[in-house]
Amino acid sequence: MKLKFASALAVVFALAACSSEQPVTPVQEVQNVAPEVSEAPALPVSETGFSQNAEVQRFIRQQAGLGVMGEGQLQQFFAQSVYKDNIINIMNRPGTSRPWYEFRSGNAGAGKINGGRRFYQQYRQVLDQVASEYGVPAEVLVAIVGIETNYGSNMGSFRLADSLPTLAFGYPRRGEFFQQELHEFLLMAKEEGRDPFSFTGSYAGAMGMPQFMPSSYRKWAVDYDGDGQRNIWGSVPDVAASVANYLKAHGWQRGGKVMVPVSMVPTPELLALIDEKTALNKTVGELRQMGVTPLEEVADHEKAVLFRLETAPGQYDYYIGLNNFFAVWQYNHSRLYVSAVREIANGVGGGKL
């Protein structure tokens, strides 16, 4: 019976995609799909299952009202979705903070760089073509795919039709975010004409070689090879163009550096600045006046963020992140992540980003 339902659901999505004449709506224009305020708290979805959960039923009515798909099809979808306790257990694990010297070893070491060189050589023509068109160096695209999924070898095997409902209704701390991503996912399956149960990804709902969330997929994924599908799972041209499109949309500047080493005395004022939220809130000229000396040429008018990397226990190197640093940071909100992308990119491309 489940296979029958899944097959019927796939037909519904395919027909909806074929009949649609409207362009994809940018993610920021999608209505908020957070659940209505309930007079009494609903029983946990872990106890009720999706179909019997009051919050899920409100979501179904809401999505049907928005025209995502019919209420009957949504009921079928949730009847087949499986609540995954292991996903909630993963999300509830305490977070760990690693210093740069450990993060670098695990994410941007020699093995990862060598893998990036092989990946680049294998797909050099299309990677260079995408780089020329979008202005994002090929080695940066390679580095992101390398960190995210080890060049496509570990894209995740969770069905998004299980993981996203589980997080949307079983993880209250970020329930609103994941309900929005579930909304985007249902629209994505409809627009792509695919059975929603055919999509796989990480436990948190990230998909493909670049690990796009559904909202990012809908807005920035690109069908670069022209086959009618935005295939971020198996088409390197689509993957490269999608990542480049994301970075360009978030402000990547052709020919710009990512970060520059600096010389400075770590005064309380500068350490407080390092601890501030990542943002381009100072100019290089202002940082010079505060005692920060760039060790490479950079214009005073450029915006920058001051940060440090722990190279050994208690030992630090200091840097300023520039515009392109911030563009990559918006892909993953971690200064260590951006630094690892740069490390791999420099190792693959032989440059000094």
Q: What kind of region is each of these model predictions?
A:
Residues V82, E148-G152, A206, Q253, ...:
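Solvent-exposed loop/turn segments at secondary-structure junctions
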